[in-house]
């Protein structure tokens, strides 16, 4: 695809070569993310961060990525603090705010809303999550993390074995990740969830139609024994009619160190898009996994900075100029990935 000036709305936009280009640029961003160097390549540019659903990691990560490239960030959070609460349309909001920004990242609870907004925007728009539909930058950073974890073991994305666990019906991160995985070869995917929260059939059929093996199960123990990656998700409480309805599914697929030791291969990598619900009755990753070296959830969040920096650099057509505007940092820094 042509990155310069483009919206990033869906992972369906990408071919394998596009993914490889994004990841190569992401690799080049490490010195800046590690605070070894500073670049001002986007000095004077403004990111409009528009988040109409709660967000910590995605919102702050996009803002941090833009700051690290030398740009400035302006934020709108929640409906109550925006003119949308007064009845303003997405069209009008897009026309106005795209006049204030050079690029916009938007999250909205309604599926398709970010694409609708982008049609009226005069600057590139990145989908930061639209309801239960897609979350392209999360899928990219997840895939980038998987590639790095496998590369450290002398493996590639081709031939990946992955188990996705939890609320696969409402989890937009796994929907986008399923589409991206289809660009690679010889995959084995196990989808583990209650029947009521199963992966939508369109994604299952997509991968099967591309020749990949996709198994569907509700048995956690028998699904995580021979995989490279366990990708856990939280119960998307905000997509249910009530907390009581969501509570029916909590704790059904909780992974802790004892289960990991008993059923997983020793080098199986554990991932999660975060936030994880650490309450004792929740559905996700136990805190006793925190010292497991194969727990990659915080490496994922670090990698999100790299991938989002790469997206900004490509969309604003400065990927080849970042180093020209750089210098060493003059403060103490000690960071690792």
Swiss-Prot record:
EC number: 2.1.3.2
Pathway(s) this gene product operates in, as recorded in its UniProt entry: Pyrimidine metabolism; UMP biosynthesis via de novo pathway; (S)-dihydroorotate from bicarbonate: step 2/3
Catalysed conversion reaction: carbamoyl phosphate + L-aspartate = N-carbamoyl-L-aspartate + phosphate + H(+)
Binding site for L-aspartate: 86, 172, 234
Binding site for carbamoyl phosphate: 57-58, 107, 135, 138, 274-275
GO biological process: 'de novo' pyrimidine nucleobase biosynthetic process; 'de novo' UMP biosynthetic process; amino acid metabolic process
Record's keyword annotation contains Amino-acid biosynthesis: no
GO molecular function terms noted in the UniProt entry: amino acid binding; aspartate carbamoyltransferase activity
Keywords: Pyrimidine biosynthesis, Transferase
GO cellular component: a single term: cytosol
Stated family: Belongs to the aspartate/ornithine carbamoyltransferase superfamily. ATCase family.
Assembly, per entry: Heterododecamer (2C3:3R2) of six catalytic PyrB chains organized as two trimers (C3), and six regulatory PyrI chains organized as three dimers (R2).
Function per UniProt: Catalyzes the condensation of carbamoyl phosphate and aspartate to form carbamoyl aspartate and inorganic phosphate, the committed step in the de novo pyrimidine nucleotide biosynthesis pathway.
HAMAP family noted in UniProt: Asp_carb_tr
Protein name: Aspartate carbamoyltransferase catalytic subunit
């Amino acid at each position: 695809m042509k990155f310069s000036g483009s919206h990033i709305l869906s992972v369906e936009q990408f071919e394998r070569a596009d993914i490889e280009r994004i990841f190569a640029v992401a690799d080049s961003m490490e010195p800046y993310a590690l605070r070894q160097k500073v670049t001002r390549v986007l000095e004077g540019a403004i990111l409009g961060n528009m988040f109409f659903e709660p967000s910590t990691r995605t919102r702050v990560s996009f803002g941090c990525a833009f700051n690290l490239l030398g740009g400035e960030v302006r934020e709108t959070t929640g409906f109550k603090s925006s003119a949308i609460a007064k009845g303003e349309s997405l069209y009008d909001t897009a026309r106005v705010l795209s006049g204030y920004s050079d690029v916009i990242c938007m999250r909205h609870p309604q599926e398709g809303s970010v694409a609708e907004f982008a049609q009226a925007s005069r600057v590139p728009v990145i989908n930061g999550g639209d309801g239960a539909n897609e979350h392209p930058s999360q899928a990219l950073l997840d895939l980038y993390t998987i590639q790095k974890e496998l590369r450290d073991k002398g493996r590639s994305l081709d031939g990946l074995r992955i188990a996705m666990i939890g609320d696969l019906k409402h989890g937009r991160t796994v929907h986008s990740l399923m589409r991206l995985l289809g660009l690679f070869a010889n995959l084995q995917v196990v989808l583990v969830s209650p029947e009521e929260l199963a992966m939508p059939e369109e994604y299952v059929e997509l991968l099967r139609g591309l020749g990949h093996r996709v198994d569907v199960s509700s048995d956690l123990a028998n699904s995580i024994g021979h995989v490279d990656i366990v990708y856990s998700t939280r119960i998307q409480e905000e997509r249910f009619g009530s907390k009581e309805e969501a509570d029916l599914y909590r704790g059904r697929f909780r992974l802790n160190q004892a289960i990991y030791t008993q059923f997983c291969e020793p080098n199986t990598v554990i991932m999660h898009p975060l936030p994880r619900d650490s309450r004792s009755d929740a559905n996700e990753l136990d805190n006793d996994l925190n010292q497991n070296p194969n727990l990659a959830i915080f490496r994922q969040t670090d990698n999100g900075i790299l991938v989002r920096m790469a997206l900004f650099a490509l969309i604003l057509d400065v990927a080849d100029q970042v180093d020209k505007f750089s210098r060493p940092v003059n403060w103490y820094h000690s960071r690792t990935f």
